Amino acid sequence: MSEKDELMAEAFAHLEAGDPETALEIGKRLESLQYSGAYEVQAMAYADMDDTEQAVAVLEAGVAHAPGVWLLWQLLGNYRSDLGRFDAAIEAYEAAGNCAPDEDLVIVDFNHANALARQGDLALAQARLDRTLESPHLAQAGRAFIENAIALRMHLFVAQGEPKAAIATYEALAKQEHDEEGSNVSMADVLAELSLAYKQSGDNAKALATALDAVQSYKWSDAALWALRAARDEQSETARAMHLIVEGQWYEPLEDEDPDGPAPEFVTTYDVVAEDEAEALRLIAECEPPQVRESLRIAETHLIDNEDASATAYKGVYATGDYHMYQPGEEDESLDD
């Protein structure tokens, strides 16, 4: 493995470990070696540090330096889309499509379709997504990618008032035979779109049950949390927005730490709109594994000062933090609010 390849692998390992600062330093070393991957690493590091503007600036420099590297164009499109610059994002995807290998066009087309959907060009998004789903290279992109593409197709059907088509799309996915496991992350988004389709078709019971399944699949999915709030469709002028620190007992030992030891305790955070702490805890419990629900307790509650939003928002969970595990008697890690 060359020095550049080793540095790239090291940088991605730091990104995966939640250390974008070190990854950024490595990216700058790669830039001094005149390697185009430097721009990819630096941009991803800036994005992980919530500086998407700087990520875009780095990538714009990158595509000027290496205009034939499709990965840089695609990443530039993704970050421009995140900033709401959809026309510029689409230009980047078109440039990526002009230099990407045939087997990678399926990914470019998917991201292109997603930007069009975000922009509200639903018909164009559907046409671009059709290119993804009809590609001969779709299977090699992996099951999780296919699930993401199906979630987007279902989203487009729901957005155009076609819930039956969305439900049929899910049923076709469920019937597909496949050797590879998908992803609980992508499946949460699929189930979220299915819940919204049931809601739109008037089947409130299925909408709620499916939204609960989506949250159990991956509770950090914004789509799943939204589907659950939409399925309940509850608003109250007296509900309050709250940031809560929640503690509980995990249900099994941590295999990577002490597989034969006791199950750890945990602390996490939730942003919830509810009448009071008791209702907030009930809503939180639905997002947690059934085995831990009885152990849940609220350690701290901080009211979010946004009266206007609380009065009009749907009740439910809006965000949840990571788990911080610790053994009883140990000092738990501090949480970032």
Question: What are these language model-derived features?
Answer:
Residues D5, G37-E40, W70-L71, L105-I107, ...:
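Start-of-helix register in tetratricopeptide repeats
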Residues L33-Y35, P67, P101-E103, H137, ...:
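Short coil turns that delineate tetratricopeptide repeat
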Residues S2-D50, N78-S81:
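Alpha-helical segment of the N-proximal tetratricopeptide repeat
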